[in-house]
Regions:
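Alpha/beta-hydrolase fold catalytic core
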Residues: 1-21, 43-46, 85-86, 250, ...
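Conserved beta-strand scaffold positions in the cores of enzyme catalytic domains, especially
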Residues: 2, 48-50, 93, 246
Length: 276
């Protein structure tokens, strides 16, 4: 399905019926990140909306969109407005969690509750291993070089690619769905560059200073073995948010929806059942 927003056309999938649940993935992945979780949540009686946000693995470029972190947060808010979604549950991961915190701080009206899985927050936007990326992509040709280098599957287990976000390699077709759009489309690559170049932790730090006003329930479903976003960050979020609880997921890195989808889905369904 497609929807026309002020910044361009956004592609999304919709599964199930009931109270709305909107999924927010991170950088260089798309809605396929949630493919093992959505059927369980939809089967429990929820309307799951799974957009491909313009973060580098989307198939429809958005050249007119403001792709700064606040701009993408506004895009999420516009998506909720255009579909007139109310009492929405946002479920976010990785970079998408940082953007979701901006939505919570600046556009909370339609949000009923939030699930944050391991994600950027506070000063860790990006985490230290990825901190050079905003400067790097400003070098002419650097984004092209980056996405072409990711052709080499041997690189996919390195910390700078998928090695520290997933304990288990996603299937080859899923990896291709993540990496092919920016490899073959200059317009998607330009979107990717614009977003990455605009990342700065001033956004997440500013959002964190306002999260104390977000009084709706928040589940922090964090990976115990998290390498990029240590549990200490989750505990800091829990201390800032008025109604948050932390649950730890075993045997997983950042992509808990990839490594432990059933465990995540159980936590989500139980949380929704207790708060909707």
């Amino acid at each position: 399905m497609d929807i026309e927003l002020s910044g361009g056309r956004l592609r999304y999938q919709e599964v199930g019926s009931g109270p709305p649940v909107v999924f927010v993935h991170g950088l260089l992945v798309n809605g396929d990140l949630w493919r093992k979780v959505v059927p369980v949540v939809a089967g429990a009686g929820y309307r799951c909306l799974v957009p491909d946000w313009p973060l580098g693995a989307h198939s429809v470029p958005m050249p007119r969109a403001d792709l700064s972190p606040p701009g993408v947060a506004a895009l999420i808010a516009e998506f909720l407005d255009r579909l007139d979604l109310r009492d929405v549950t946002l479920i976010a991961n990785d970079t998408g969690g940082a953007i979701t915190q901006l939505v919570m701080a600046d556009h909370p009206a339609r949000i009923g509750r939030v699930v944050l899985t391991p994600c950027d927050c506070f000063e860790a936007f990006f985490p230290s291993v990825f901190a050079p990326l905003p400067r790097f992509v400003r070098i002419p040709g650097a984004t092209w070089l980056l996405v072409q280098a990711l052709r080499l599957r041997a690189l996919h287990r390195l910390p700078l690619t998928f090695g520290w976000v997933a304990k288990r390699n996603p299937p080859a077709d899923v990896i291709d769905s993540y990496l092919m759009p920016s490899r073959i489309s200059p317009e998607v690559r330009a979107d990717l560059r614009r977003f990455v170049a605009g990342v700065h932790n001033r956004y997440t730090l500013a959002a964190a200073s306002r999260l104390g006003d977000f009084d709706r329930p928040v589940l922090l479903a964090w990976a115990r073995e998290e390498k990029l976003f240590p549990i200490s960050l989750a505990r800091r979020l829990a201390a800032v948010l008025p109604d948050a609880r932390l649950e730890l997921i075993e045997d997983s890195y950042t992509f808990v929806s990839e490594d432990q989808p059933q465990a995540l889905a159980r936590l989500v369904v139980n949380f929704l059942g207790a708060t909707t």
